[in-house]
Each structure stands twice: as C-alpha cells, then as structure tokens.
C-alpha cells in the first residue's frame, strides 16, 4: 500500500489521540514496486506512542476500506472493506441500509476550512486534509478537549456522515483483465522510488503539490464548480449535524446558508470512483448515470435502526449494553447486570442537575429579595436625607430667633432709657415754663405796684425816669421770658408730633408682625405634622425591615442547610466520578490492546499483499507460463480472504467506534456534572458573600434608623417639653380642684353626721330609761355605726392619699416656677444683647454719617480746586491775549516807522519778499499750533465736565445713601416700637405668672384648711367612739327594760331626717361638680392662650432677629459703597494732580515761546533798521504780524508741551 507524503516529513512529539485521515489517491506504481521488492514495515511502528485512524483506499478489488493506522510515519495498518452497489432510487438520498463510513472531513462545527480540499494522499501542500486529525490523549480524558483552529482534533462523536447526493456513474462490473491492471500500474510514476522509502526520500516541489485529477476527468464541469462552491461552506460554524445517516434527507442543491450534503460525501464518492476507474481498461466505456448506493452490513444496520430518544433511560441502557456486548464473550445476564450497575451509578448525576436547577431558582429569589431590601434602604436613606436639612434648618431658625429676641430686648431697654430721658427733659421744660410763668406773674405784680406808686407819688422827674427805666427793664425781661416760653412750647409740640408718628408706625409694624407670626406658626405646625408623619413612616418601614430581616435570616439558614447537603452530595459524586474515571481508563486500555491487535493483523495483511504482488510480478515476467491460471486462482482466494478480513476489521472498527462514542458521551456527561457541581459550589460561595453583605447592610440600615429615630425623638421631646409641662400643670390644677371639692363635700357630710350624733346623744341621755328596754335595736344601731366608722376610716385614708398628691403637685408647681424664673432670666439676657446690638448699630450709623460728611467735604474741595484751576487757566489765557495785543500794537507802530523808512529804502524789496514768504510759512505753522492748542483746550474742558459729572453722580449716590440711612433709622425706630410692644406682652405674661402663683398660694391655704378640718374630724371621731363605748355600757346595764314602740318611732324619724340631709348634700355635690367643670374649662382656655402668646413672642423674636440681620447686611453694603466712593475720590485726586502738572508744563512752554517771539521780533527789527529797506505796503506787514498769528504760535507751543 501507499503511504502518505506527510508521513515522510519530520513530525514533532505527538500525544495519545485519535487521528483520522482520508486518502483518495489510487495506489501508485512506486508503491507496487516497493511491495514487489519485498520491503517490510518495521514492527516497532505498530507499537508507537500514538495511535489513530487513517482512511485509505486500496485499488485491488475496486472497493475502498478503512485502515487503522498508528499515526506514526511508516506505520502499518489494516483495513475494513466498504462495499458499494448501485441504487435504483431517484430521490438522491442514502437508503436506510447504507454502510458508508463516517467521513470525519464532512462537517465540524466552529472551524474554517480551505476552499479547495485535496483528495490526494501524496499532496504535501495540503494544510488540513493532509494532516491527521487528533483527538484527546488518554491523560486528557477527564477534562474537556480544547476546540480551537490550531489544534484540529475532534472526537468520534463529532464526525458524523451526511446524506449523500447523487454522484457520478460508477461501473461496479468485474475487472476486465490482469493485463490492463499491469499497464495501469506501470503507466504511473515510473521514474520514482517505490514504497515507503521512496515516499520518505521524495519531496515534491510546490508546483506539483496539486490535488489529484483522477475524478475530475470523469465529472462534468458544473459538478466541479458546485463542489468548489460547497467547499467554501464546508466549515460553517452555524451548521448542525445529525448522528444518524438515514435521518438527513436534503436536495442536492439547497439555497440555504447551511452546507449541502454533497460536501459530506464528496470525498467518499470521489475515492470510490477513483478505485473503480483504476481497475478499468484504458479505453473508458460509456456508463449510464445512476445513483450511489453502498452495501450495508448487519453492524451498520443495527446502529441505524430506530432508537429511543437520546435523553431517556432506555437509550442509555441500549448504548451501555452495546458497548459492553461488543467484543465480549460473556452471557447476556452478566452484561445486563453490568448495565444496571452503571445506570445506578449515573442516576445521582441526573439528580444533581435537578438539584442545581432548584438552587439556581432559590438564588434568583434571594437576589430579588436582596434588590427589594436595597431599594427600601435607599428610600429610607433618601427620607432621612430629606428630613435632615429641615431639622437643621429648624434648629438654625431657633438659634437665629433667640439671637434676634435678645437683640430686640436690648433695643427695647435702650428705647425705654431714651424715652425716660425724653420724659425727664419734658419735665424739666415744664418746670422751666412754670418758673417763667411764676416770674411773669411776679413781674406783672411788680409793674402794677410800680404804676400805683407812680400814681400815688407824683414826685420829681428824675424819680419818674428811674421808674420808667425799671419798667422798661421789666418789660424786656417779660418779653424774654415769653420768647423762652414760646420756644419751649414749640419744642413740646414737635416732640408730640414725633410721638404720634412713632405710634402710628408702631401700630403698622405690630399688625405686620402679627401676620408674620401667624404665618410662621402655621409653617411650624405643618413642619411638626410632616415630622410626625415621617416618624410614623420610618417606624413602619423599620418594622417591615425587621420582618424581612427575619425572613432573610430564615432563608439564609435554609440555604446553609442546602449548602451542607449539596457539599455532601458533591463529595459523593466526586467519589463516583473518580470510580467511573478509573473504569473508563480500564476500558481505554482494553481499546488500546484491541488496536494493537488490529495493527498486527494489518501487518500480516500487508505481508500477504506483498507476497501476492511479487507473484504478480513474476506472472508478468512469464506471461506464457502455465502457472498463470494457478496464480489467478490464488489471487481470487486471497481477495476473498482479504474481503473476509476487511469485513472482520470493519465490524471491529464499528464496535470500537461505538465504544469510543459511548465512552465519550459518558465522559461528557461526567464533565457536565462536574462543571455543574463546581458552579453550584461557586454559587453557594457567592450566596454566602451576598448574605454577609445583606446582613451588614441590614445592620447599617438599622443603625441609621435608630440614629434617625433618636434624633427625631430628641426633637419631638424638645418641642413637646413645653406642651407637656403646661398640660401637666393644667391637669394637676384640675385634679387639685376636684380633690378639694371632694374633701369639702366629705367634710360637710362628716359635720352633718357629727351634728346628728350629738342630737342623738342628747336624746339618749334624756331617755336612758326608755332605751334600756330596746337593747336589741340599739345593738343593731351599734353595728351600723361600726360600719360607718369603717367608711370614715376609708375616707380618712383617701384624704391622706389626696393630701400627698396635693403635696406632690405643689412640688411640681415649685419646679415649674423655677423654670419660669429661668426663662425670665434668659429673656432679660436677650434684652441686654438687644441693647448692645442697638448701641453697635447707632455707632455704625454715626461712623457712616461721619464718612459721608467727610466725603462730601472732599468732593466740595475737589470741585473748588478744579474751578480755581479753570479760573487760573482762563486768567492766564487772558493775560497771554493782552500781551499778544500789546506786541501786535508795538509791531504795528514799528511797521509804520518801518514804512516811512521803506519809502527811502526800496532797493532791498526782493530780499524782503523772500523773508516775507518765509515768515508767512512760519505764521501758518503758528496757526496750526494755535488750532491744536484750541483742541487741547476743548479736551481739557470736556475732561473737566466729566469730572464735574462724576462729582455730581457721587453727590447723588451720597444722597441715596443718606436716604437709605434714614430708612434704616426709621426701621430701627419701628423695631424699637415693636420691642416696646413685646415688653408689654412680656409684662402681661409676668402678670399671668403672678396670678398663677397667687392661685397656688390660695390652693395651699385651702389645703391647710382641709388639714385642720381633718384634724377636727379626727377629734370628733375619737369623742364619738368614747360616746359609743358609754352607750354600750349603758345598754348592757339597761337590758331588762323594754319600751319598743316609742324608741322605734323616734329612730324612724331620725332616719328620715338623715335621708333628707343626704339628698341635700348630693344636690350640693352635683352643683359643686358643675362649677368645677366650668373652672376646669376656664383653666384650659387660659393655658391655651398662654401657649399661643408664648409662640407669638417666639415668632416675633425670630422675625426681629431676621430683620436685624438684614440691617447688618445693608450696613455692610453701605460700607462697601463708601469704600468704592473713596476709590473714586482717590482717582479724581490723581487726575487733578495730573491736570495741575500739565498746566504747569503749559505755562513753562508759554513762557519759553514768549521769549522766543520777543527774540525773533528784536532780530527782525534790527535787520530792518540795518538794511533800510521799505516794505511794499502796510497791509502786507500787518498780515505778517497779525495778532491771530501770534496767538497761533503760542497755542502751537502749548500743544507741543502737552504732547511731550
């Protein structure tokens, strides 16, 4: 037989595995030559370190067969014959009894293949089909085999055949002759070495490494193109294959993306055609197109029969039975026992899959619950975050309000001091007025007396003059006094007007404050309601979370139990897995032994084939001998023996394949189960982690909830402290009143009883003789009196308990009084703080007034300085103009003089004209300079205007600030008025507190009275007991006397009187109860009013604190504005200084220009006098020395200096 060229190539170390190779090229002449020469394969190759399956085609009988090869280079092999026959069916699919061997190159999922696959066995250029596929080694049976393109190995399970398509016509007729075979073998590859050594030594060039064209010559062009097209889809990863050949029936050309079944059997069909063609005559005969059909053996028919579904127990039994039955000589009963044992061992693995599904379902439920708990925790955290800012804001508001209240109290005290001072001043003024009026009356009386004296005494004229002087002086004094009085009255009127205005503002502020207080109170109520609701929700959520936590703990316990059970089961299954693994290794070793035996059989077959080939060569050498017939007979016998051996080998291979498949299936099942066990362990570990995290989260959430609840409880306690104290005081007052009323009623009852007892005693003393006969009735009365004594003792105990409770109530009232005193002290401190803040505000106001005045003064100074600078500039300009006029006049005079002289000197006119032109140019330049100076002047004027506007703006801003300050003062006055009102409210509260104290004192006095009454009652009781004892003794002495009628009537009358008294006392009791209820209602109303007033005061304090803060902010803004004005003032000062410097430079420049002009004028005059030349006309001279030109010169010089 021929060996593949890949065997000759050097190959690396190969692991144990199944290698599958498909050889489609016919037997070459070189190989036949090697067989003829008797070349024998070494025996050690059959026992190499690797094994595999190589599919080759033997071209003797025209039929292919499967050869088991060791996978090593040069290894021998033996084959199993594959028989074929024509099929008369027209459908194009394989029949159910087809015996086509499994083609490992038909379809393997997930691996790309080259588009052109070679069918030649000697093609070294093939990258896939030329190499043997390798399965897993014996050491790697426990783990899953890697499926990557680099390692192109696969198990026997993945190598399933596909349905065959209609192939080319194949002639299965008997061989034509031996001569044709000889010619066939001799015609191919003559110059090459034969046999395995030739393959080893021969290396084909790349040009000759092409696929065999043995079949392509017989196939039409369309089938070749179709095969080439189908080879591209040969390794589609989306393909799915079936393990049964008869189940796949598809058309030959399908447009679907799945590979065509033609690609699955293209190689087998080609090999069979090649085998048939190799034994035909050189002249090919025309053949009818028929469908392929292969002969079937009983083994393949048994494998292809309808079986149970793959996942059922029957299917597993059948597979295990087939595996154990193949190649064993045991009885059916022993084989079935083994099958049952294997199934029992595999049953727990199936159960593990169900247990793993349950664990996965439990894990899903746990994850859902974890998500729900996390959501709830997030919601609670959000609620807490929402409540925290409100709580913090309320605390801040409380602090701010307390600060504002303290500041307002200080302001109130300050205002009170100012009001007292104003009252003192008014009183002083009133005293002065009274004194002035008294002086006026005294002076009037003096005037009247003086007038009388004048009338009486008509003395000399000097005396009259003295008197008149005195009168005049007194009149002047009176006028001065009247003027002072008028001034004082005017001041009083102004003060009264201011007071009325303040009162009106205070009323408005009070109304606004009341509204604001109500609004704030409503907001506080809403906030408290929201807090209560949030607390209720938090408590509910906490309860829900606790319940869920308990559920989770129960679930965790159950999961832990399941984990322990699963761990035990996994240990058991691991032990079972190891046992199965050992059994599989044992079976693998048996398979290896069987394969070794197969290889030995193949070696023997190869030797026989070589012998036969030698004989054939000898027959060719001696064609005319008589031995030819015998050789042919021997050939037929050997062919029959080969067929039998091939059939046996095929059966053994099928059995081995089945065993391998079943073993691989069991291995895959065991691997899947092991993977599931590992996944379960990982899932259990993850579940434990998640449970720990859940516990930590629950603990954190519970801690956070506890903290939030504690904070909310503290807030609620703080808020409810005042309410609870007030309610407790009210309830205690009500209880005291009720107890007092009850005690009064009991005292009345006891007094009535005492009065009745005294009357009874008097009567009994008068009628001792009558009562002695009625001893029995009196004993009954004594029993009744004993019962009354018991009731009195119970009443006494009740009174003692009530007295104790009253004492406790008094102690509580004392504590409340202390708390109220502390609150009053705190209010006093807050008032002091308000006073201090008011003083600070006044000081800040004074500083602002001072700064504003200073800024106004500085602005005025700046304006005056700028005006003075302008005036100086204007005066300088006027001076310059006057000087220029004078110079022009002098120049005109000189010109007139020069005109007279020019008449004499007319010779130098030309020179003078040139000089005149030059002077004209100079005048034009001076005019330009003058224009620039005017422009500079205008710019300066504009700058001055801008500065004036800025000063005006600053003044306006200062006026606005002054207005704002006035507004602040008005607000402060309003706040002071509000403070006064708050002081009034505080005074009212103190009055109410005093009233409560008075009521407490009254209650104490009443309690003392009750105690004294109780002592009196006890004394009366003692006296009654003594009287009872006396009566008992008297009754004992007067037992013999009997007067029942009179005593009975008297006792009945006494009973009626007592009943009437009891009814009257009950009526009084009802009246007292009604009065007590009314009083209780009044007390409750008073407590509610007190609470409202306290809240009102607190709200007012908060508002005042807010207003004080707003005023502080306004003061800060005013200070910032003042700083900004200072900066602007400094900028203005800098600009003025720069202007002064520019003016000084201009003045210096003007002086220098004046000097230059005087020098030029003197020089021109000297030249004119020296030359004695006259001008043409006076007009030209006047035009040259025009005053405007001189002014332009001056302005030009000024502009130059300014530009510098």
Swiss-Prot record:
Tell me which residues bear Phosphoserine. 95-96, 98, 135, 137, 140, 155, 165, 214, 217, 260, 278, 340, 353, 1176-1177
Covalent S-S links between cysteines: none
What is the annotated signal peptide range for this record? none
Alphabetized UniProt keyword annotations: Acetylation, Cell junction, Coiled coil, Phosphoprotein, Tight junction
Q: Where is this region: Head?
A: 7-359
Kindly list the positions at which N6-acetyllysine occurs in this protein. Answer: 581
Phosphoprotein recorded as keyword: yes
Tell me which InterPro entries the record gives: Myosin_tail
The GO terms this record gives for MF are: microtubule binding
Q: What is this protein called?
A: Cingulin
